[in-house]
From Swiss-Prot:
<feature type="binding site">
    <location>
        <position position="139"/>
    </location>
    <ligand>
        <name>Zn(2+) 1</name>
    </ligand>
</feature>
<feature type="active site" description="Proton acceptor">
    <location>
        <position position="171"/>
    </location>
</feature>
<feature type="binding site">
    <location>
        <position position="172"/>
    </location>
    <ligand>
        <name>Zn(2+) 1</name>
    </ligand>
</feature>
<protein>
    <recommendedName>
        <fullName>Probable carboxypeptidase AN5749</fullName>
        <ecNumber>3.4.17.-</ecNumber>
    </recommendedName>
</protein>
<dbReference type="InterPro" id="IPR011650">
    <property type="entry name" value="Peptidase_M20_dimer"/>
</dbReference>
<keyword id="KW-0325">Glycoprotein</keyword>
<feature type="glycosylation site" description="N-linked (GlcNAc...) asparagine">
    <location>
        <position position="184"/>
    </location>
</feature>
<dbReference type="GO" id="GO:0008233">
    <property type="term" value="F:peptidase activity"/>
</dbReference>
<dbReference type="GO" id="GO:0046872">
    <property type="term" value="F:metal ion binding"/>
</dbReference>
<keyword id="KW-0645">Protease</keyword>
<dbReference type="GO" id="GO:0005576">
    <property type="term" value="C:extracellular region"/>
</dbReference>
<dbReference type="InterPro" id="IPR001261">
    <property type="entry name" value="ArgE/DapE_CS"/>
</dbReference>
<dbReference type="InterPro" id="IPR002933">
    <property type="entry name" value="Peptidase_M20"/>
</dbReference>
<feature type="binding site">
    <location>
        <position position="139"/>
    </location>
    <ligand>
        <name>Zn(2+) 2</name>
    </ligand>
</feature>
<dbReference type="InterPro" id="IPR050072">
    <property type="entry name" value="Peptidase_M20A"/>
</dbReference>
<feature type="glycosylation site" description="N-linked (GlcNAc...) asparagine">
    <location>
        <position position="323"/>
    </location>
</feature>
<keyword id="KW-0378">Hydrolase</keyword>
Length: 424
């Protein structure tokens, strides 16, 4: 038996043990959090991933670690370069012993939002209730570790399982990592042009913090920037200038309410599945001093779409701004551009939930799901699932429990099993 299988079996023995089997063979004083983490190959992998800073744009170190780990566990690894300010790459891996090309893809992201927060553990009398903290422990290195372990356990039980792993960069910023993978005809081939490595994916399992629920879909997104040009003057003589701030405020007031206004009255659409479209004015900047009439004003806005397309939402926003400002030519709305030109963003994403045994939910946050091109001819199933809560992701109190991590391995294996049943 080779070392990779032994390692996989070690992971199996930990993560599939019942609560009773893991019960206190040691007293509270005998079991420190460090010893508990050190004793588990799975929790140690999660610790090592979280301990490596990987804020978007600086993912190379964690990518190298993950690539080395997978190679040591009998995976062939491809480091796919991703354009950017620094040299960074996606990690694509498939088992070297698999007799067939991969058709089941497990994927998550290895970048995090800033700032880096060191790994730490809070002890609990029940080992499964131990709380792990640190940047990325929840979003999304919990999913990364659980997907790796689920794949290892599956391969230990079924060495011919046609699995592949993909861990991308830049998900938290613009999705450049997933788009680079999506456009790669060797790693993500079309049905008309199969590659020597991959025939085509039948199932794609995305990892994000979903509280262990299977997600039936998430809202779409549209981002834009509002810029207003005015004319500066002394604040004692404001009529000599033109306040850009006074011009932008009515526009922002209308934009802020678009999700609450019915479509027939010029608002953004809602849906039964996703509720209402929400608008967030995330940044406003104007002027240089309190005693100067501001010559410029800017705002950044993000819209979470409950229905419709980005193009339709763009038209609604432009009409609302024109109406609020009297079609002022000094007011410019610039929308984020898509990778192939045109307006960026995406419509709501509907996902599959046909595997029994999961709670079903929808989420409001965005993912890499729309950045990965799938081919209808392949009859692709797309699942979104993972440990941890989005409510603590990105915050200074980001955390996850051992129980959630362990349950996620079982959940990913259940999804893999369903995917295998579709193939065989």
């Amino acid at each position: 038996m080779n070392l990779s299988i032994l390692a996989a079996l070690a992971l199996v023995s930990f993560s599939t043990a019942s609560t009773e089997q893991q019960s206190p063979l040691f007293s509270h004083a005998d079991r420190s959090p460090k010893s508990i983490i050190d004793a588990s190959p799975f929790l140690s992998l999660h610790r090592d991933l979280v301990s490596i800073p990987s804020v978007s744009g600086n993912e190379s170190a964690v990518g190298e670690f993950l690539a080395s780990f997978l190679e040591s566990h009998n995976f062939n690894v491809i480091k796919q370069p991703v354009e950017g300010r620094t040299s960074r790459f996606n990690v694509f891996a498939y088992p070297s012993s698999a007799p067939s090309k991969p058709s089941i893809l497990l994927t998550s992201h290895i970048d995090t939002v800033p700032p880096f927060i060191p790994y730490s553990v809070q002890y609990s009398d029940n080992e499964r209730d131990i709380v792990i903290s640190g940047r990325g422990c929840d979003d999304a290195k919990g999913s990364v570790a659980a997907q790796v372990v689920a794949a290892l356990e599956t391969l230990a039980e079924n060495p011919s399982a046609p699995l592949a792993l993909l861990f991308v960069v830049d998900e938290e910023v613009g999705g450049a990592g997933m788009r680079a993978f999506s456009f790669n005809t060797t790693l993500n081939p079309s049905p008309d042009s199969p590659s020597s490595l991959v025939d085509g994916y039948k199932t794609i399992i995305f990892g994000e913090p979903t509280d262990l629920a299977l997600v039936s879909g998430h809202k779409g997104m549209l981002s834009f920037h509002v810029h207003v040009t005015g004319k500066s003057s002394h604040s004692g003589y404001p009529w000599l200038g033109e306040s850009a701030l006074s011009t932008i405020l009515p526009a922002l007031s209308v934009i802020d309410k678009l999700g609450d206004i019915p479509v027939e009255k010029g608002g953004l659409p809602s849906s039964e599945k996703y509720g209402r479209t929400t608008v967030n004015i995330g940044r406003v900047e104007a002027g240089v001093a309190g005693n100067v009439v501001p010559a410029a004003a800017d705002a950044d806005v993000t819209v979470r779409l409950a229905a419709g397309t980005p193009e339709e939402a763009m038209d609604i926003v432009l009409a609302a701004v024109a109406n609020a400002t009297g079609d002022n030519p000094h007011v410019v709305v610039k929308f984020a551009e898509g990778p192939n030109g045109g307006v960026g963003g995406y419509a709501p994403q509907d996902l599959d939930t046909d595997v029994p045994g999961f709670e079903i939910t929808t989420v409001n946050y965005g993912t890499d799901v729309p950045n990965l091109k799938v081919y209808e001819e392949n009859d692709v199933k797309r699942y979104l699932y993972g440990p941890g809560s989005i409510h603590v992701a990105h915050g200074d109190h980001e955390s996850i429990t051992v129980a959630q991590l362990e349950e996620a391995v079982k959940g990913y294996k259940k999804l893999i099993t369903a995917a295998l049943e579709r193939i065989y």
